[in-house]
Swiss-Prot record:
Originating species: Solanum tuberosum (Potato)
One GO term describing the cellular component: cytosol
Family affiliation: Belongs to the phosphohexose mutase family.
Chain sites annotated for binding alpha-D-glucose 1,6-bisphosphate: 97, 190, 359-360, 423, 442, 444, 455
Function, as annotated: Catalyzes the reversible isomerization of alpha-D-glucose 1-phosphate to alpha-D-glucose 6-phosphate. The mechanism proceeds via the intermediate compound alpha-D-glucose 1,6-bisphosphate. This enzyme participates in both the breakdown and synthesis of glucose. Promotes gravitropic responses, negative in shoots but positive in roots, by facilitating starch granules (statoliths) formation.
Transit peptide: 1-72
Protein name per UniProt: Phosphoglucomutase, chloroplastic
Catalytic activity: alpha-D-glucose 1-phosphate = alpha-D-glucose 6-phosphate; O-phospho-L-seryl-[protein] + alpha-D-glucose 1-phosphate = alpha-D-glucose 1,6-bisphosphate + L-seryl-[protein]; alpha-D-glucose 1,6-bisphosphate + L-seryl-[protein] = O-phospho-L-seryl-[protein] + alpha-D-glucose 6-phosphate
Subcellular localization(s) per the UniProt record: Plastid, Chloroplast
Positions bound to Mg(2+): 190, 355, 357, 359
Activity regulation comment: Inhibited by the Calvin cycle intermediates fructose-1,6-bisphosphate and ribulose-1,5-bisphosphate.
InterPro entries in alphabetical order: A-D-PHexomutase_a/b/a-I, A-D-PHexomutase_a/b/a-I/II/III, A-D-PHexomutase_a/b/a-II, A-D-PHexomutase_a/b/a-III, A-D-PHexomutase_C_sf, A-D-PHexomutase_CS, Alpha-D-phosphohexomutase_SF, PGM
Post-translational modification Phosphoserine, affected residues: 190
Gene: PGMP
Length: 632
């Protein structure tokens, strides 16, 4: 298939209007296929950060505050460090994300960690077990020591931390659930760039493995405004490069293999022998791009050692503090090198990538891109046959509101409960905990199931490999294999195609972006069914609100929607997952049941709606932007 007809996304350069991120940081690096050390010797190098914002060791507590001993338990001396509130620590369910230099300010991270403990009931951590890990980005090493010492100072019994501080977001969730931990810290800014000039983040997950709810994140923020002391254990830095247990009085730190628990879970979810039957075939080739991010630590043990892929199939497989000067966001812009390989002459049969902390994924076939909206729908439609974990069928399906309606049609055909929720994985987690939901996804390259309480990039890759393996299990050597494109087109023929695109305008000036959303809210307040927008007739327009069927909580102002009589949709949202500015996202969708039109390029099929979206929103007037940063 020609690239023009198969590729439902367009790659565009970051405009010079984007501020705060230098163009040199976002150059498209060549894929590097590297030899891997054994996991037991796996380690990556750190640069030294100076100055350290909150030096805590046996000989010093803080460069900025005097301290006093307030408690001593056996060999564990607890110190109280006076502090003052620091502005700008508003916390969401994705935690707190800022530039590294912000977190390096005196007591900035320490204040937030202490505010978290001040927000939790004592029984949620006292003498309990907490998990700690991250994506390997710059500042994680120093942050891990701060977190360990403050946890000890607040009475935590044990910290379980991944070797070298490495644990993917989904592995943290899996470890929390398997070890019945009280919760866990994740050191990551997800898909945002890493390095001294870029982003860092921290979030807390609860005992279900789910991100802390707003009731807790709001308390954390409130406590950052009134904090006056930090409780910290006077212990030396813990060596995170060696597996094993270190004890300080009644507090201990266990350094664990970051892969073991997660790999065990994946082997319980999927039929690895089925996947191996495909991956080890000489006529099947695939590439997994770890983008020099956390899944590099998982790729070889899973894809090579367990499933029989060649070592050369893993690209950018060594986690680096700055992600190899790349932007670890698996889309058609930032994973362009992988895209070029799949669209190149004699490209591999299957390609995939994951992001900084491993929770996002991108799926590609030879000269074919699978939209995240289609991906989750296809996994849901095929899971009962191809994935061992779902052999009794899924309990229910759900998607975020901006995600296309592909999944809705699967739920309808399979007669399954279906939920449309705001953007944010926590909304899925509530439904999972209530036993109402098995498979869910977001158009922002997030896919997952109730095996954990986070989206899971490697899970999605294994799900697709399972589907391909199942569809090809009876194919003899030399027979043409069922391809990714075949699977997707078969799905479209059965369910229809939802043409879908997302325009991202990154790091816009916040005032203009907010003014645009307010303008749209005013516009929809005056709208009514039957209003004409060019050739489109309005069904309804609203600002999406959601009442959680589990706990009754209400989330309002979740995105401005224009839904037309033919089912087409235009949605406008501001995203808050960056560390600076605002990202304006526009979502455009149109359903097409006619198989003869399914091979159209999405940008061509959607052009009338795209033009309407830009016109209605007056985006250029409000933001000054001529072109989007990324088109998906």
């Amino acid at each position: 298939m020609a690239m023009e007809s198969a590729l439902t996304s367009t790659r565009v350069s970051i405009p010079s209007l984007c501020s705060g991120i230098s163009s040199s940081h976002h150059h498209h690096r060549s894929l590097s296929f590297l030899n891997f050390p054994k996991l037991s010797s796996f380690k990556y190098s750190f640069r030294t950060i100076s100055p350290v914002p909150f030096v805590v060791s046996a000989s010093s507590v803080s460069p900025s505050s005097p301290s006093t001993s307030v408690a001593q338990s056996q060999d564990l001396k607890i110190k109280s460090v006076p502090t003052k509130p620091i502005e700008g620590q508003k916390t969401g369910t994705s935690g707190l994300r800022k530039k590294v230099k912000v977190f390096m300010q005196d007591n900035y991270l320490a204040n937030w960690i202490q505010a978290l403990f001040n927000s939790l009931p004592l029984e949620d951590y006292k003498n309990g077990l907490l998990v700690l890990g991250g994506d390997g980005r710059y500042f994680n090493r120093e942050a891990a020591q701060i977190i360990i010492k403050i946890a000890a100072g607040n009475g935590v019994g044990k910290i379980l931390v991944g070797k070298d501080g490495i644990l993917s977001t989904q592995a943290v969730s899996a470890v929390i659930r398997k070890r019945e931990a009280n919760g866990g810290f994740i050191m990551s800014a997800s898909h945002n760039p890493g390095g001294p000039e870029y982003d860092w983040g921290i979030k807390f997950n609860y005992s279900s493995g789910q991100p802390a709810p707003e009731s807790i994140t709001d308390k954390i923020y409130g406590n950052t405004l009134s904090i006056s002391e930090i409780k910290i254990a006077d212990i030396p830095d813990v060596d995170l490069s060696q597996l094993g247990v270190t004890k300080y009085g009644n507090f201990s730190v266990e350094v664990v293999d970051p892969v073991a628990d997660y790999l065990e879970l994946m082997e319980n979810v999927f039929d690895f022998s089925l996947i191996r039957s495909l991956v080890s075939r000489p006529d099947f080739r695939f590439v997994f791009d770890a983008m020099h991010a956390v899944t590099g630590a998982y790729a070889k043990p899973i894809f090579v050692d367990k499933l029989g892929a060649s070592l050369e199939s893993i690209a950018n497989g060594v986690p680096l503090e700055d992600f190899g000067h790349g932007h670890p966001d698996p889309n058609l812009t930032y994973a362009e090198d992988l895209v070029n390989i799949l669209y190149g002459e004699n490209g591999p049969d299957f390609g995939a990538a994951s992001d900084g902390d491993g929770d996002r994924n991108m799926i590609l076939g030879r000269s074919f891109f699978v939209t995240p909206s289609d991906s989750v729908a296809i996994i849901a439609a095929q899971c009962q046959y191809a994935i061992h974990y779902f052999q009794s069928g899924p309990k229910g399906l759900a998607r975020s509101m901006p995600t296309s309606g592909s999944l809705d049609r699967v739920a309808q055909k399979l007669n399954l409960p279906f939920f449309e929720v705001p953007t944010g994985w926590k909304f899925f987690g509530n439904l999972m905990d209530a036993g109402k939901l098995s498979i869910c996804g977001e158009e922002s390259f997030g896919t997952g199931s109730d095996h954990i309480r986070e989206k899971d990039g490697i899970w999605a890759v294994l799900a697709w490999l399972s589907i391909l393996a199942y569809r090809n299990k009876d194919k003899k050597s030399g027979e043409k294999l069922v391809s990714v494109a075949d699977v997707v087109k078969d799905h479209w023929a059965t369910y229809g195609r939802n043409f879908f695109s997302r325009y991202d305008y990154e790091e816009c000036e916040s005032e203009g972006a907010n003014n645009m959303i307010e303008y749209l809210r005013d516009l929809i307040s005056k709208s009514k069914a039957g209003d004409k927008y060019g050739s489109y007739s309005l069904d309804f327009a609203d600002d999406f609100a959601y009442t959680d069927p589990v706990d009754g909580s209400v989330a309002s102002k979740q995105g401005v929607r224009f839904v037309f009589s033919d089912g087409s949709r235009i949605i406008f949202r501001l995203s808050g997952t960056g560390s600076a500015g605002a990202t304006v996202r526009i979502y455009i969708e149109q359903f097409e049941p006619d198989v003869s039109k399914h091979d159209m390029d999405a940008q061509i099929a959607l052009k009338p709606l795209i033009d309407l979206a830009l016109s209605v929103s007056k985006l250029k007037d409000f933001t000054g932007r001529e072109k989007p940063t990324v088109i998906t």
